[in-house]
Amino acid sequence: MKARNQVRFVITIVTIVFAGEVCFASGGDFEYWSTAGASLDINRDWGCTFEEELRFKDGGGELYYHHSDLGFVYKGLASWIDLGVNFRKVYSKNSAGEWVQEDRPHFNATLKGKVFGLDVSNRSRLEYRDRENEKDLWRYRNKLTVKLPVELTRLKLQPYVAEEAFFNLDDEGFNRNRLYSGFSVNVSKKVKGDIYYLWQTTESNGKWEDVSVIGTGLKFYF
């Protein structure tokens, strides 16, 4: 791993955190989610990732969620599987409008390959939710992503679809589902972008509630 890449990686993380805090300090019918991240190859088998995400509700005007996520990925087992361990710090508003914290370590196994010429990945995630003023719990998430083998316009937009199911490992069980449709784009050799529409349904008190989300993302590679 080159020292110059290490320095760039740290600078990128600091920039992402600073940008997130600026948005956090600023003060509807849909939500807007904004994600920025960085990925660093430590060596041939190991990588390090960092991510910041902000979520706005009430037409994209009120910040209600923010997380920072740091993780390590092992890619040396086989070309078709990545293993990861992460720690996520979450700040979100509760029903009273108060900010509460959550510590969320999570473990990931991502299977990837080609099926009928399509790029397909399936990520299994097991996370422990250590929540402030609420019961702690384990949750399992499974996300299936399919990328189409086409590139649209001069920007080389690649369309994809995805579905993610959430299962609380208690009496509640399956309680959330997300459907994605979007485009990924290579902004440059080391920067990738993402824009998507997400439809989320969540079970609450025996009723299913839905929300529409427009999301954008940027990821830097080192």
Locate the predicted segments by residue.
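Start-of-domain marker
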Residues: A25-K75, D82
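Residues that define the transmembrane beta-barrel architecture of outer-membrane proteins
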Residues: F30-Y32, Y64-H66, Q101-P105, D136-Y140, ...
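Membrane-embedded beta-strands of outer-membrane beta-barrel proteins
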Residues: A36, L70, F107-A109, N142-V146, ...
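Outer-membrane beta-barrel proteins
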Residues: I42-R44, Y74-A78, L111-G117, L144-L152, ...
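Repeated loop/turn-to-beta-strand initiation elements of outer-membrane beta-barrel proteins
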Residues: D45-F50, S79-L83, F116-V120, L152-L157, ...
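Membrane-embedded beta-strand positions of outer-membrane beta-barrel proteins
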Residues: F50-E52, L83-V85, A109, N122-S124, ...
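Transmembrane beta-strands of outer-membrane beta-barrel pores
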Residues: E52-D58, G76, F87-K93, G113-V115, ...
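Outer-membrane beta-barrel "beta-signal"
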Residues: A109, D210-F222
